[in-house]
A protein has these predicted regions:
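Bacterial N-terminal signal peptides
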Residues: 17-26
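Mobile cap/lid helix-loop segments that gate and shape the active-site cleft of serine hydrolases
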Residues: 203-239
């Protein structure tokens, strides 16, 4: 099992495929529906030979959501430019899956600081909190919000508030006393978290690398994807965006839904690349929505540790005029 990277460059494709093969081997622990069993001790509790961790708690501005943030700091000395750093949503689930063998792999290259942003719960997900924090406000047409009903019943639309908390309170505390390379600051999210990453790519310049895994684009009838494809490249020259999507999907529409979704994403990525934006599509063949969490977060970490960036010279050239 491997991931296909849709862009030119055989050597880069082979390197990425090798990295994600490893990520997928570690990604066997995944579920079509969230496993809400209480979590046991994680790598921060057990200790690591390659990273040390600190934990901090935060509250939302309205006092309704409560966060726990794990910051994993490599024991390996920082490079002259500073550590890369990856902010990871659904931090409880990430910490439950973060393993010593993976940390060892990261340490063998350029290990990133890992900031796992979770909630003050012993469950892998706080479903109500993440639904609010990770989703942008729905587009309003004719006085009504454009979005799906049914499965999308939890209150959403709080991504702007959460992004403000993440960038203005959580990040300064997480990076305190650590030498960070701001040019290698990334963010990863899965499902609703993937939506947050896309919305942040449009709305914020705090990060440089944006990893959006299986974003729940159907929530707003793909209007967010339309906004992405209409982006002016001059505003986004300094950013890299990675769509990470499995080419299988659970449920009764497994034969039609993935093809439609992937086709729309492929077309969107193609349009963005043609306009000079630094965008890639990473395909995980045969991986369903749930297991994409495991495969994609490991893929993002491994990618960050290589120090690779997308070629954005065309964008840089146009922006300098």
């Amino acid at each position: 099992m491997y991931a296909r990277e849709y862009r030119n460059g055989g050597r880069r494709r082979m390197l990425f495929s090798a990295l994600v093969c490893v990520a997928l081997l570690y990604g066997a622990k995944g579920y079509a529906k969230p496993d809400m069993a209480p979590l046991g001790p994680n790598i921060a509790d057990r200790g690591s030979a390659f990273y040390h961790f600190r934990v901090e708690n935060f509250d939302s501005a309205d006092g309704r959501r409560h966060y726990r943030v794990w910051t994993g700091i490599p024991d390996k000395k920082a490079p002259a430019s500073g550590y890369p750093i990856l902010y990871m949503l659904d931090g409880n689930a990430v910490m439950d899956r973060l393993s010593e063998p993976l940390l060892k792999q990261l340490a063998e290259k350029s290990p990133p600081v890992i900031v796992a942003v979770g909630y003050q719960t012993n469950l892998p997900f706080d479903l109500n909190a993440r639904a609010y924090d990770y989703t942008p406000a729905l587009e309003v047409k004719n006085g009504e919000a454009v979005g799906k009903s049914g499965r999308y019943q939890r209150k959403g639309g709080g991504s702007e508030d959460f992004r403000r908390l993440l960038e203005m309170r959580i990040a300064p505390n997480a990076e305190r006393g650590i030498k960070i390379d701001p040019e290698r600051r990334g963010v990863w999210g899965h499902s609703y978290g993937g939506l947050f990453v896309l919305d942040s790519w449009l709305s914020s310049s705090f990060f440089r690398s944006y990893y959006s895994a299986s974003p729940s684009l159907g929530r707003d009838n793909f209007s967010l994807l339309a906004r992405l494809t209409a982006s002016d490249k001059a505003q986004y020259c300094h950013k890299s965006l990675f769509f990470m999507e499995g080419s299988a999907s659970p449920g009764k529409n497994a034969q039609t839904q993935p093809t439609d979704t992937m086709s729309k994403i492929h077309n969107g990525v193609s349009a963005m690349r043609q306009s000079g934006l630094a965008v890639e599509y990473w395909d995980y063949p045969g991986v369903t929505h749930g297991p994409m969490l495991n495969a994609s977060f490991r893929g993002a970490l491994l990618h960050m540790s290589t120090g690779r960036t997308l070629g954005i010279s065309q964008c840089d050239k146009s922006a300098s005029r």
